[in-house]
Amino acid sequence: MTEQVPAIDTLGRDSWRIFRILSEFVEGFEELAALPPAVAVFGSARSARGSRDYQRALEMGRALVEAGYAVVTGGGPGDMEAANRGAKEAGGESIGLAIELPHEEGPNPYLTTSLSFRYFFVRKFMFVKYSQAFVILPGGFGTLDEMFEAITLIQTKKTRPFPVVLVDDDGFWDGLLDWIENTLVARGKVSAGDPAILRRARTPAEVVEILRTTKVPEKAR
């Protein structure tokens, strides 16, 4: 006789999960509602302190604060820590929107506001809603995820256009941009004008100049 396996009440558990999702939205709205104009900085969590990449992210955070922006990151180590450190040391708002992951370090020590999310989609919503621009430093899958989320929302007109700036001075993004232009555009997978959503800069000063000369939308989207 086959043993009966009790059914898992997936529907019930999913229904209760709604309250956790709502609570994360409410907490994010309440904590970030008074945030001044802000720029989100994304990059590698693996950049070691003292490395060239870490130093660039630190200078990015400092430059953005000096230009009048708060800095928002994923709140973790590496480039995120560096950008938050630069922002805080420059006397600015330094926000971390962390994600709960197994075996992940806690928030970095350079935050003036720290939030933690269980759900990636809630966290992404906060980045888009409360940032006037995305600055994309060299990074891995997580960095690419945030970048493609932004350009997809802009492409599909689910949000007003805002600057998405790829930063490198060593050709890190060249291969990706070549693939977008010579494969996606060439094969008709995206429109010829879509690559223009992405801007490029070599230095923090160039990023600030792009923000200064670009009509940046209000944070509420």
Named regions from a protein language model:
Residues 4-97:
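Glycine-rich beta-alpha loop segments
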Residues 7, 26, 32-35, 54, ...:
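PLP-dependent amino-acid enzyme catalytic core
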Residues 32-34, 63-65, 88, 105-109, ...:
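Solvent-exposed alpha-helices and their adjacent loops that cap or buttress functional pockets
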Residues 55, 78-136:
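Acidic/glycine-enriched connector segments
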Residues 101-106, 143, 171-174:
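Short gly/pro/ser/thr-enriched loop/turn and capping motifs at secondary-structure boundaries
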Residues 118-171, 213-221:
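Active-site/ligand-binding-proximal alpha/beta "capping" segment
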Residues 167-169, 174-221:
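C-terminal functional extensions of proteins
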